[in-house]
């Protein structure tokens, strides 16, 4: 199990860094971290099939992941976007199948006015949960900022078509419809 100090080194980890860490664990003489090469191969295979995440390979539990998410959220709320960006990128790397990590990354990039990257991050979140209006709606905001009308309309239409009009979704659906109407008039 990775501890807090070990988690800090993962915040700026690249895929190559993660691979090196996995290799280091595989070659370790320490019985607590020794992992058979066969197990590594199985984990990597599961990773590419989407059956596990890097967090599983690193031994990061839900409490640690939630702690990292809270840290990223607090950085974001405090306007520390560079720190939030590092944290959300690490979270997306560690658990690529968790939509809220991609939403956090998208929101951070959007606040940094990196609209294309933000829209891409929102796109990952939308693919993972197409019934959540937030990723597509915020991607549309990014496309509007980029003056990409076609992609903005597509994102807004996905909000209207794919999202159930639940009390929490309705404000996004109503805003999407209103923006689409404004876009038709221009």
Positions of PLM-derived features:
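Start-of-helix register in tetratricopeptide repeats
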Residues: 66, 100, 133-134, 168, ...
